[in-house]
Amino acid sequence: MSDPGFLEVVTTWIALLASYNDHKTIRAIKEVLIMEKELFDYVAERAGVLATADTSKQDTKDAAAAWKDAVAADNSDAAVEVATTKLLDFLEGRPTTIDGVIAFAQGPAKEMMGEEAAAKMLEAQLARKEAGAKYCNCPSCAAASELLAKFGRIEL
């Protein structure tokens, strides 16, 4: 995620701090770098789901692929932040709410999936709503809502 220059600076600082035996500072720097990588991996994993899931609409697949292409072309922190913000802006308002899934199960799902499958879907979604779920749990909606929640744009 960071450019080589950034990593060189961090490595130099770690070496400098190590010479002063400042283990708390070294540990703090390592934790920040690990957290940064974990967040990048979190976004990358969900972008991968959005780009390939059968439940994703084409424009969602395109937005996720654009994120992947952008960070592959320029993995500097600034470029990753811009690409991630663009993806999050696109995703806002897209995950289907639990009420939307329930309405689907009560109506169109009956024709598309049959009465029995729609009834099972409805039962499962009503149970999820009762347990506090706010969004659809299909792979695309789950990935999108997890990303939006991670960046504080929605609450799960």
Per-segment meaning from a language model:
Residues 36, 57, 77, 134-137:
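Amphipathic, non-membrane alpha-helical segments in soluble helical-bundle scaffolds
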Residues 4-7:
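Short hydrophobic targeting helices and cationic amphipathic motifs
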Residues 35-69:
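Short terminal alpha-helical segments
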Residues 10-34:
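Short, Lys/Arg-enriched N-terminal segments with co-localized hydrophobic residues
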Residues 117-156:
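Amphipathic alpha-helical binding modules
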Residues 60-112:
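Aromatic-anchored, charged helix-turn/loop surface patch used as a conserved interaction hotspot
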